[in-house]
Amino acid sequence: MMNRVVLVGRLTKDPDLRYTPAGAAVATFTLAVNRTFTNQQGEREADFIQCVVWRKPAENAANFLKKGSMAGVDGRIQTRNYEDSDGKRVFVTEVVAESVQFLEPRNHAEGATSNNYQNEANYSNNNKTSSYRADTSQKSDSFANEGKPIDINPDDLPF
């Protein structure tokens, strides 16, 4: 059996950060996720999904996400219930996030009403490689050796 959820959407309000009596951080937020189809009026509708994240990722979400921020959530669906102050049984379905990705630059959420954005950061916990634009001038590369072969003794290599 599998219980896996991957969502991309925008926060409807700033994350709510709290701490348990044991000191564990927990943040809750609602993610507005557009549906892939349009309604009869040709408009896209959204689902508003409650998300919970724990410990250090909760603190990061509270510090770096705010209303309108685009975020990716990877986690699982959880259902729970409790008795409210009136004695009624309340059922809750939420996503417990195992990871939260910040999908736009920190200062970009102010203009979040526009869906036209350039994703400048690509984060993945499973990808150990990163790419960046390097200065390709020969002056900055001390190992360029002006195109000549490098004489290295195989005994000097650590592998």
Swiss-Prot record:
PROSITE patterns: SSB (PS50935). GO terms for biological process: DNA replication. Pfam families: SSB. Residues 106-159 are annotated as: Disordered. InterPro entries: NA-bd_OB-fold, Primosome_PriB/ssb, ssDNA-bd. GO terms for cellular component: nucleoid. SUPFAM superfamilies: Nucleic acid-binding proteins (SSF50249). Residues 128-143 have a biased composition (Polar residues). Residues 114-127 have a biased composition (Low complexity). GO terms for molecular function: single-stranded DNA binding. Keywords: DNA-binding. Residues 2-104 form the SSB domain. Homotetramer. PANTHER family: SINGLE-STRANDED DNA-BINDING PROTEIN. This is Single-stranded DNA-binding protein 2. It comes from Listeria innocua serovar 6a (strain ATCC BAA-680 / CLIP 11262).
